[in-house]
């Protein structure tokens, strides 16, 4: 990652902030990948998605995609620092030093200060999964993106985060003018993992267009085939995209809209970002 410590901004309170890089530098600076207003980030022990709220793009200085990317970027940096400190500690209780929720709070505070110094507005959801050795997975969520753990031996989800809304189609979100904060509303789910378990994190474009049973069916077939994780993610995206583009299709989003008395039909056209990861034992580890 390119070091940008020599170029910083001041937020007026004497706090030195990292600067937003130029377009040419951005690819080398930010952790993760942007997909529309969504962003994703991944490593060998953590994965995460964020869904920038697109309505901000119609406002002056609104930038939904930047908010989602910054939240994941700073969360990844803080998480890596927590893991580094834990690994260098003499304590046997490694997990007590690692908190994806506190890392998200730190990211939220940094992103808020940085964007405010440039008068950039926006909000985003965030959904994260972090593996702490030997086999503890922490799922952390704010908003309507979701994380799931699928156990092939049982053919079902054994854990999941719940969607969070203020009201229909208005998720809890982090950023400009939102009362939500990670420590205030963040949801944490702890899972004891087994080898072969599959973790999925996805923005709402997936589960707004596919029912849980459809996703489980796809995952079951994929697990039996032994195919690559990337192929499963692509399969889920393509299936959700097909429903999203069908104005007469049946979808969970349509069902929820009808329950609210809204005459909405078909799928929900949206950015769709999915990460699929499999829990595997490292070589040489008992």
What are these model-derived regions, one by one?
Residues 1-286:
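PP2C/PPM-type serine/threonine phosphatase catalytic domain
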